[in-house]
Amino acid sequence: MSPFTADSLTARAGPRVRRAGTPARPTPVSPLRPPTPTRPEPRRPHRYAQDVNAGETQRAPWIVGVSGASGTPYAAAVLRALLVAGEAVDLVVSRASRLTLLDETGISFRDAHWRDDLREWLARGADGKPDTFQVDVDPVRYWNAGDLAAGPSSGSYPAKGMLIVPASTACVAGVALGLSKDLLQRAASVVLKERRRLVVAVREAPLNGQTLRHLVALDDAGATVVPASPAFYAGATHIQDLVDFVAGRVLDAAGVPHTLYRRWEGELGGGSRDD
């Protein structure tokens, strides 16, 4: 009898190689265990509002930050003028500013109903009367101030610049020192490092040396400081006129056209001119 058996010959020859063009044998499937279905990869949520990439589908917005200083009518006037000018707006409302807004207007700004609350806020005049203005808030996107992973926290996020109206001394200090305790301060720091326009409408009186040094630091970093102090040469007859003047100066610093106040031409107060 030959010492070579069929099993030994197969073991020595190694695994059988399939010729080119020969169909592969199907993998046997146990009738007792069905094949495991392939699970689709979960979608990663977008960081952008409305589940879109703002840089690809929308024009670059102005970021408007509202801090806790008194002067929420200034912010409302700036927001209205930006929307009238056809600008897209990204809105960041700090926690402290919600308390100020509630105290000055009686409006509670809620994350879940921010669009309705914003519409009511912008419709109110500086004298507190509701339904003074009609405003379309659809071009506004709202970002929670606690979301440090939001779009405006990155330099790659498209933005024309940022307007902080009103700016509290705490907000001024945080931005001047490069802190990022919330999205408002982080967005301002990003705007500065990207060499975009930052307008800070500080609303405080009196100003001590520490705050003045912070304002100088912001100016040195490239920001424009606009004190929330109205002028009276434009013939103001209503509190809204005074608010609009400050809002207009903020927009002037940002380069946004508006018609909020009557500009000085040398004759507004009846003064004489040399002929």
What are the language-model segments listed below?
Residues F4-H46:
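Compositionally biased, low-complexity flexible segments
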Residues Y48-L198, P206-D275:
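A cross-family phosphate/adenosyl-ligand binding-site feature
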